[in-house]
Amino acid sequence: MAADGYLPDWLEDTLSEGIRQWWKLKPGPPPPKPAGRHKDDSRGLVLPGYKYLGPFNGLDKGEPVNEADAAALEHDKAYDRQLDSGDNPYLKYNHAGAEFQERLKEDTSFGGNLGRAVFQAKKRVLEPLGLVEEPVKTAPGKKRPVEHSPVEPDSSSGTGKAGQQPARKRLNFGQTGDADSVPDPQPLGQPPAAPTSLGSTTMATGSGAPMADNNEGADGVGNSSGNWHCDSQWLGDRVITTSTRTWALPTYNNHLYKQISSQSGAANDNHYFGYSTPWGYFDFNRFHCHFSPRDWQRLINNNWGFRPKRLNFKLFNIQVKEVTQNDGTTTIANNLTSTVQVFTDSEYQLPYVLGSAHQGCLPPFPADVFMVPQYGYLTLNNGSQAVGRSSFYCLEYFPSQMLRTGNNFTFSYTFEDVPFHSSYAHSQSLDRLMNPLIDQYLYYLNRTQSNSGTLQQSRLLFSQAGPTSMSLQAKNWLPGPCYRQQRLSKQANDNNNSNFPWTAATKYHLNGRDSLVNPGPAMASHKDDEEKFFPMHGTLIFGKQGTNANDADLEHVMITDEEEIRTTNPVATEQYGNVSNNLQNSNTGPTTENVNHQGALPGMVWQDRDVYLQGPIWAKIPHTDGHFHPSPLMGGFGLKHPPPQIMIKNTPVPANPPTNFSAAKFASFITQYSTGQVSVEIEWELQKENSKRWNPEIQYTSNYNKSVNVDFTVDANGVYSEPRPIGTRYLTRNL
C-alpha cells in the first residue's frame, strides 16, 4: 500500500530493507553500500527518457534533457559527495532531497511530479525514525547554490560553445524573494499541486493569510508576489524563454458593452458589425516578445527547426490604482479593496482574435511598459447591420478570479504536436535533383517531324535526356501552388504612374465582398538578381519604430524577402507555366496559354512562409469540416487549440450614489486603473543542425554593412527600434 498515496510498492520494499539494515548499524558513520555508489557507466533505475532522474545512475551521461533531469544531476552529485565522506544519504532525508524538491516545486512535468512525490514519501516514512535533518539544515537562510560547469553559457554566450551546458534554474513562479532571500515558512518537502486541466488557475492569498499548500506566498501589500525574469535557458534539444513586462489596464468603455459597425456610406467590401467590450486581453503572439535579437541569432544559426511545447503564464504584483481630482491636483493611490477580474477562455467560446497581426502585444524591449489592448470582435453582418446568426457575448457570464492588490494569477498550457518550423534554406533546386554525369534510362518525345531531303513529314521520334537536356528529363515533383501577384519595383520610376494597389490587386470574393490575397500562399519574392522587385501583396511588411499609420514612405517600412523558397515555390510575380488549350490534328496546330494561378496537384512539394522575429507565432485553425494544409499564410504554427485568450478587466466600483432609490442603472464609477507584471515562459523543442557540409554556411550576422549605429538598441531619446526583419533561413539542407 502506498504511504499517503505517494509511496509505490517497489520504493516501500527498498526503504523497508534500508530500515532493517539501520537497526543493525554499529557506532560511527555507516559504510556506503557498494551498489549505492555512482558509476559513470551505470544506467541505474532511470526514468525512461531521462539521463539522471532515478537512483544509482552514473554522473557522466551528457547534458540533462530538461530542468527535472538537471535537478536530479545536482542531487546525485550531492549524494556522491556524502558517500565519499562516509555518509549514507540513502537511509535518511537531508538537505539534498529538500533542495531537489525546492528546485522542482513549479515543475509540472511527469518526471518533476514523480521526483517530488518520491522524496516527500521518503521524508514522511523517515520522520518517525528520526532520520530527517533538522530544519536548520533543511532550510538554511540562504539557498544552496547550484553548481555550474566553468564552460556553461548564459543567454548571451556564443553559439557552438564546446563542453557541457548544464541547465540553469527555471523561472520560479512561486518564489517571493531573490536567490539570497530567506525562504518561505513552508516545509520544503510539501509538493505543489499539479495543474489538473487546461486553464487551471491559482490566486495567491491576501496580506496576512497563511501559506498555501502549493507554496504560493502570502502576497500582501509590502511583499512582492513574484520576481522579474527575462532570459533564455538552453538545455540541449530545448530552450526555455522567459519574458516579464509591466502592463497597465485602463477602464474601457466606462464598463459598458457597445455595438460597433462600419460607417454609413462605407464601401460594401469594408462593411462590418460587432461589439466592443470593457475587457482587455493579453497578447504575446510574436516571437520578439520572447526572444532577444541575440537569442534569436543563436536559435537560427544552430538549429534546423523548432516548435513550441509548453507555456506558463503569470500575472503578479497586481496593483489597483484610484485616481482622484481635487482643486486641479491629480492624486493616484493604491486601492486595497478594489479588484480586477481574470479568466482564460479555455473552451474557445469567445471569438478568437489572437494571430491577426494586431498591435498591443508584449513589447520587444523589456523596459518598455505597455497598455493591455481592449477586446472587441466581429460577428456576421449584412452591410453594417446584424443578422439572425449574429452572436453577442457577455464576458461576465464566464467565471473569473477576483484579484486584489498583492494577488497573482497563473495558467499553464501544453501545445498540441505540430511539425518543426523549417529554419533552413535549400541548397538544391527541385528541377535539379539528378546526376549530371549520366543519361536517364527513360525516353522523351524529341520530334514530331523529320526531314527527308527537301520534304518534311510527320514522324514521332524519341530520345534519352542527359546532361545537355536537363529541362527535358523526367521529374518526380512539381513546384507548389501559385496565385500570381502584380510586380512592383523599389525604384519608383520603374512603376506605372497610376494608383493601382486595389484595382490591380489579386483578390478573392467571399460573402459578397472582395478581399486582398495578402500575403497569400507562400511564393518566392523575385527571381535571381532582381532584388529590387517584390510582389504587391505577397510579403509581410512591418513598420519601423515611429512610422505613421498612413502613407508611410518606403524607407520607413521593412519588407520581408522570401527569395530562399524559389527552389521549390513559384515566383509570386511570374506565371506558373504553360498549359495546352486545344486538340491538334492534321489540320490544326497545337496551342498553349499561360498559367497564372495553379492549385494543388498530386506530386507538389513546397515550403511554408518563413517566420520572423517580429512576426506571429501561431494562428487558430478555423473550426470547419475541411481544411487543406492549414499553415498560417502570415507564418507560424497552425493550431486547432491554441493558447486560450486571457481576459482581464477592472471591476466597476460605483461612485457616490444618490441617497434616494433610483431604478436607473449606474453610469458613474470611481476612476481606476490597474498595473502589475506579466511573465510568460515558453519551452521550445529544437532540431539541432548536424550538417556534413564542408564549406562554411551563410549565417545571420549584424555586420551586414558598415554602420555607425548599433542595431536593435535605443536612441538618444530612449526609444527602442528594430531596423530590419530577421527570418530563420540561413543554414542550408539538401532537398
Language model features: what each stretch is:
Residues 2-154, 170, 177-178:
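Extended terminal accessory/targeting regions
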